[in-house]
């Protein structure tokens, strides 16, 4: 299966890229991450340099799932450029220049808490977009274990926008930070997503109170 998925990435090197093959390739990128296909790391790192935003976004996410330490420098390069650049949007779109959420989440998932990585992530905790701030805090909480990065996430769980509340809930679950349990339980979010977040806590903790919380929903 994995060799076939890797082969499905080849059309992304064509110019122009066939739209149907592009869609297949994007699904292959996602699948390689889910399967934690370490032998796909090199190809996924190359795809981080493509002009296609969605390809960079999904490649970053999958490299995080694979925990590809060799990709750290490539991911950090996507975060570089200073405050002006990271706030810029693409012409005719609401999307930013880079898929910062998936890049930040990938660095947190890879788990290398080097000084250079921390320095690169930290400015994004002040980004104008709440979900990017959340992704940065999520990554820093994963990398450092410092609860000061959990505080902004807890606060964002009270945001007026339900989409932001949902995203932040999943971020808290992904960190495995057990003190977030009461906030997850109390959040104004549907129980189906609370279960996903609680499952994230349960996967990283042996505390049975998480299982009790899941049963109570």
Show the residue positions of the predicted features.
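Amphipathic alpha-helical scaffolding segments comprising HEAT/armadillo-like alpha-solenoid repeats
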Residues: 1-15, 37-49, 68-90, 113-125, ...
């Amino acid at each position: 299966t994995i060799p076939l998925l890797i082969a499905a990435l080849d059309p992304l090197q064509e110019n122009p890229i066939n739209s149907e093959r592009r869609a297949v390739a994007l699904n292959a990128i996602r699948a390689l991450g889910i399967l934690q296909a370490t032998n796909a790391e090199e190809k996924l790192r190359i795809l981080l340099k493509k002009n296609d935003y969605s390809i960079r976004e999904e490649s970053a996410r999958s490299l995080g799932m694979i925990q590809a330490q060799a990709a750290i420098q490539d991911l950090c390069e996507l975060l570089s450029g200073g405050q002006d650049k990271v706030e810029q949007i693409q012409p005719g779109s609401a999307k930013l220049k880079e898929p910062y959420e998936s890049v930040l989440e990938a660095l947190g998932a890879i788990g290398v808490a080097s000084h250079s990585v921390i320095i690169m992530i930290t400015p994004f905790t002040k980004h104008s977009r709440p979900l990017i701030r959340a992704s940065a805090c999520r990554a820093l909480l994963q990398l450092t274990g410092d609860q000061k990065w959990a505080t902004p996430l807890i606060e964002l769980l009270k945001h007026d926008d339900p989409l932001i509340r949902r995203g932040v809930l999943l971020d808290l679950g992904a960190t495995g930070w057990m003190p977030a349990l009461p906030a997850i339980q109390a959040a104004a979010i549907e129980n189906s997503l609370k279960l996903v977040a609680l499952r994230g806590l349960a996967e990283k903790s042996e505390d049975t109170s998480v299982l009790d919380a899941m049963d109570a929903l």
